[in-house]
Design a protein with these regions (language model features):
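Short glycine/serine- and small hydrophobic-enriched flexible loop segments
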Residues: 56-63, 129-140, 198-201, 239-243, ...
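Aromatic-rich carbohydrate-recognition surfaces in CAZymes
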Residues: 1-90, 121-124, 250, 254, ...
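Extended ligand-binding clefts on enzyme/binding-domain cores
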Residues: 17-18, 39, 43-49, 73-77, ...
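Alpha-helical solenoid scaffolds that mediate protein-protein interactions
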Residues: 1-4, 8-11, 15, 61, ...
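CBM-like carbohydrate-recognition segments
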Residues: 13-37, 43, 183-188, 197-290
């Protein structure tokens, strides 16, 4: 984990202009790097989620020991820069977002990135987690950003919850009410419904979390037996199932994956995030949060 944190901080973008495209850049963001030579085209999937999930990693490492906390203290300035990248994707009174896809209405929802300013439900659930981490990190002296993370968190939580229309969550907050999901469409419409409970924007055992999880499984319940509905395995579904204590489906999926592992094989497109999400699911089932 320390190696990854060091690598990530060494890759931070430290100027407000993208050297590859000449376009505006968010300081503290990180590009995608490829292969052993770590080449980049100056692009990323998002700024908001990358920063948010990184802050969560930092918090979890700091909680393990005082030694880890002291190690991170030495990197306080750079970690604060990552927090600022997340902050600078969030639509607030002091930050005007591009309005290509949505309104600048100070709702404390994040956009994915400057050149694709969409307020995604999935990203904002991750950002909500990142704001919780940032609040903890600031309280523990590991970042020094001059913002009130409690306000950011409360406002972001309220706006994510407001994307629920009584039946489903909108998968993005587009202009003029766009973003209403088609639940027969796996990505992003259906699978995004699992994210508010998974990232605890709403309680995982709440009526809404159970309702959207049940709806998801009506159309895509065969995930547990190994059916894929996308190019990737999406093991994060198993993690969502674990947070709602669906032991049967999680155990069925784990047996499916073990059927590959026992033969020294892997499921197609089995990347680190897929393995990590499944390990989190197993851990949650074995150590349920009471």
């Amino acid at each position: 984990v320390k190696k990854y944190i060091t690598w990530y901080l060494n890759k931070l973008n430290r100027t407000n202009i993208n050297p590859h495209t000449g376009q505006p850049e968010i300081i503290g963001s990180v590009y995608d790097y490829y292969g052993d030579t770590e080449t980049t085209h100056g692009t990323y999937d998002s700024v908001d989620s990358y920063a948010a999930t990184f802050l969560e990693i930092v918090m979890e490492l700091a909680k393990l020991s005082e030694e880890n906390k002291n190690w991170l203290q030495e990197k306080k300035d750079d970690i604060s820069l990552v927090a600022s990248a997340m902050i600078n994707t969030i639509d607030t009174e002091s930050f005007s977002i591009p309005t290509d896809f949505t309104s600048d209405d100070n709702d404390y929802l994040s956009i994915a990135k400057l050149d694709y300013p969409v307020k995604y439900l999935m990203d904002n659930c991750e950002v909500n987690m990142g704001l919780k981490a940032a609040l903890w990190l600031k309280d523990n002296g590991l970042i020094d950003n001059a913002v009130d993370f409690s306000t950011f968190l409360a406002q972001n939580t309220a706006s994510v919850k407001a994307l629920y229309n009584g039946t489903v969550f909108r998968w993005n907050k587009g202009a003029n009410g766009t973003g209403t999901p088609d639940l027969s469409k796996f990505y992003a419409d259906a699978v995004c419904q699992l994210y508010p409970g998974l990232f605890q924007v709403i309680e995982p055992d709440s009526e809404i979390a159970n309702k959207v999880y049940t709806q998801f499984n009506r159309n895509f319940g065969s995930w547990a037996s190994g059916t894929t509905y996308d190019d990737y395995p999406w093991t994060i579904i198993a993690y969502a199932a674990a947070t709602i204590n669906d032991v049967t489906r999680v155990e069925t999926y784990v047996k499916h994956i073990y059927s590959y592992n026992s033969k020294g094989q892997q499921k197609d497109r089995w990347y680190s995030a897929e393995a990590g999400s499944l390990l989190l699911a197993i851990d949650r089932i074995q150590n349920p949060i009471v």
